[in-house]
Amino acid sequence: GFGRLGSHFWGFEMSGVIPDIITLGKSIGNGHPLSVVITKKNIADVFNNGMEYFNSFGGNPVSCEIGQAVLGVIKEEKLQENASSVGNYLLDGLKNIQNKYNIIGDVRGRGLFIGIELIEDMDNLVPAVDEAEIVVNAMKDKGILISLDGPDHNVLKIKPPLVFNKKNADYFLESFEAVLLKSF
């Protein structure tokens, strides 16, 4: 969400559906503890039955202003467009690296949400679980935090901040290729 995919502000928009209820957390507050529930009026009206919901921080004007400010920065600084252009640049760079290293079975993603699937054997698509852990730790040693995902924990998950730029992408690509060259 929040434009990370570049092409869409919300991930569900890619599927052409509108959910009945949407929950937001963490990113909307940019470090400030804030979460949001968004729903359709007919669903919200069901809760208007005389029972009062109370929360000490519900509707806090400071929190609401922070959420509005975060959305404003995303729009004003064109961070969704940045996610698209820098994400495409990073994806292209990763696909070029994929052509050099058999351990990379697939590179996929959209915007600044990218996965790199590591495999031991291209013919049998055996997940490279131990190797994925090695890459995550080696990237951490270079000051880059990525994580593992997928049912076999062999997919490197790359979700940099929305302000990630081409210079950051170049550093990531150089570091990633150096790790692969040294480790495999």
Placement of each model-derived feature along the sequence:
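Conserved N-terminal phosphate-binding loop of PLP-dependent enzymes in the Aspartate aminotransferase
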Residues: G1-F184
